[in-house]
Structure formats: structure tokens, C-alpha cells
């Protein structure tokens, strides 16, 4: 199986610039397999309208907390520690995760970041807003029919959209696959969901898995509703100009962290998953 690496970068724009330089090889070398987008679960109980945790297993993309992937776990701990510092210093609690293009592993990063945060004893709400290719429900073995889409179309309320997972502290609002509908994210209902998430997790964390920035105009809407943004870049796959375009489209969003997926510098210690 293909071995991959994750590297958590800095929050400042010079970190973004260095990452852009590292992706230059991606303009000449393509074809890398995308990161797996399946994962795991935590149990928060059924109180407050949250659906009971399932009794299913854990998907292969969940590596946070698995000793087999120690070095990669360390990268997620670094990233989660950075976000916790932002929460303490600047009152940032709601983070959007995206990438420039599809297949860069942003759902993998969102899932494992959420789990890494929850392992610190806080509650985490993970929201899948990628209606084009939703994956978190599959990773966590949950039913996507009662989630974001049902909420946005006014079929259920906020509490009913949340589903407890098999991992303590982690709750998911899943997404069912649907055609592109940016207007759903621009409606007052989406703003109401974010406001409800902020109120319910005011002392904890919300992680939003957004669609790829260059593929979905709704990402600009969702990212601007968040406190800060985590950008995922496939180091040997994503063209530099694509990352630059994505950052231009998301101008004004605070960069909370940079994740280089499949990051393979010769000086880095090896960290494998697959």
C-alpha cells in the first residue's frame, strides 16, 4: 500500500509560501493516489437529541491515537496543539478544513484533527459540508440521511442533525450526497447552524470539512463563517498555481494551520500509514 506523510505547517503566510515552493514538483509529477477518507468514532451519548452511537468498527483512515502511526500522530498533535493555543489566546474555536483540489486528503485531515482534539478531553463537533463527495459518515459508520442536508432543507432541527460516534467526545453532523447547491450555504439556515454550533461548543471545538476550494463556490461561504482555516496541500501532487488561486479566493480568512499531506523531505523521519 502507498505510504504517505503528514506535516503540520505554521500559521503565518511565510509557512504558506514555503509550502507553495514544495508543491512545485507537483506541476511536473502527478498521479499520486488520494488519501483515504474513512475513519472512526467517539461516544458522547444520546442526550440533547444526539443520535446513539453505533456498534460498528473503525474505518481505515482513522489513525489518531493508533500507536502504529506514532510519527503521523505526532503531526496531528502538533496541529491540534496549535488550534488549542489559538482558542486560548484569540478565542478561536471553529475551524474549517479545505484544500485547493479534490484528492488531497482534506477529509482525512479533518477527521484525524477532530479525533486528536477530542483525545485531549474536550468535545468536538465535526461537520461534513462536502455535499458533492461526503465521506465522514462512511468513515464513522453512520447514516447520512439525518444530517446537514436535512437540516438545511428544514426537515430536522440542529440537535437532530448531530450523531454521536463511537469515540468519546466526538459528534458528527454528516452529509448526504447532493448536486452542487451553493445557495443552500448562503441561506440564513446555514448561518443559524453555525450560530447553534458556536453556542453548543463555546468552550470546545467545531471542525468543518469543506469541499475543495477551486471546485465548489460554497467553500468561500463556509470558510468565512469559521474562525480560522486549515489548508491541506498534497506536497507532490498539487500545482503551485492551484494553491495560490485557492488562497486568493479565501483571502481574508485567517490561516490557522497548514498541512502538507504526502510530505516526503529526505531529512524527515519516516511516518507511514496505508
Task: Cite the ranges covered by each PLM segment.
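Conserved catalytic-core segment of NTP-binding enzymes
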Residues: 183-274
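Hydrophobic positions on the alpha1 helix immediately C-terminal to the Walker A/P-loop
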Residues: 109
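Active-site signature of alpha/beta-hydrolase-fold catalytic machinery across serine-
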Residues: 112, 116, 138-139
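P-loop/Walker-type NTP enzyme "switch/lid" segment
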Residues: 50-81, 85-88, 99-104, 122-202, ...
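Generic detector of well-ordered alpha-helical packing
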Residues: 19, 129-131, 210, 262
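Pre-Walker A (Motif I) flank of P-loop NTPase domains
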Residues: 91-95
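Conserved NTP-handling cores and scaffolds of large molecular machines
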Residues: 20-27, 83-87, 117, 121, ...
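C-terminal lobe/tail of nucleotide-utilizing enzymes
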Residues: 2-77, 241-274
